[in-house]
Amino acid sequence: MIIIGGTATNWIDERLSKLLVSRLVKIEHKVFPDGESYIRIPERLMGEDVLVVQSLYPPQDKHLVELFFILETLNDMKANKITVIIPYLAYSRQNRRFKEGEAVSTKTVLNLIKKTGATSLMVVEPHHYEELQYFDGEVKIADPIPDIARVINGKVTNPFVLAPDKGALNRAKRLSQELGCDYSYLEKQRDLTTGEVRVTNLPDLRLDGKEVILVDDIISTGGTMVQASQIAYSKGAKKVIATAVHSLFVENAYDRLINAGIKEIITTNTIPQDTSKVTIVDVSESIARKI
């Protein structure tokens, strides 16, 4: 088994190579003056089983097209089994048609990954598990929640896990089981035109003296986490920590979270981060466990 390090790996390919004791082949890559990408696989891989590591963090479209180039090249080389490992799957939030005429972006992305040569797929903590049915092949999911829980355990003594919306309820349950504490969730409603989010159902939370851990799969603008933090403090929380597997931090999200009283942000390396601002959990071990 050979690991192919793509153009957007954030060192996960190198860590996997060490964990799995597998040879790593790095893609040769450059960008032409007009912005087009060039890739070359520098070894012959006929008959080989390969693991392609390529995350789809911004610029998503560029990294996605480069993944297609890698997969079709491996297919042309007649590699045997081609497993694609995607730490962060872009377009996962557009997994259904919210308005008439909208593209189901997740479906298109996964269909093209299959058609360009992937025989199997692994994703780290997808937005919705159901969306992976669009990939016509073997699918595995890497779960970094136990690894995140180990980091949190060393920071809290009286934890309570809170999902900022119902979609994150399963993650909250899993994290609470790892931490051995209670959990709950908020309900929100998003305006499909403006993107504005508001809490529509507030449970009877008693958080006096609790260290509240907000958990979600993605932090984008941080709006959902900001509201959840404000609610947690209004219910008596002693401290609020935010954790998400994939953190994009767009539109000054980091500053908004800190200004909302969040004392620490724990995330993973599926997307490159500023290590001076956040605590980072490596997802390589969770990926290796599934191979």
From Swiss-Prot:
GO terms for biological process: 5-phosphoribose 1-diphosphate biosynthetic process; purine nucleotide biosynthetic process. This is Ribose-phosphate pyrophosphokinase. The keyword Cytoplasm applies. The gene is prs. It comes from Sulfolobus acidocaldarius (strain ATCC 33909 / DSM 639 / JCM 8929 / NBRC 15157 / NCIMB 11770). Its main location: cytoplasm. Its EC number is 2.7.6.1. The active site is at K188. Keywords: ATP-binding, Cytoplasm, Kinase, Magnesium, Metal-binding, Nucleotide biosynthesis, Nucleotide-binding, Transferase. Belongs to the ribose-phosphate pyrophosphokinase family. Class III (archaeal) subfamily. Binds 2 Mg(2+) ions per subunit. It is found in: Cytoplasm.
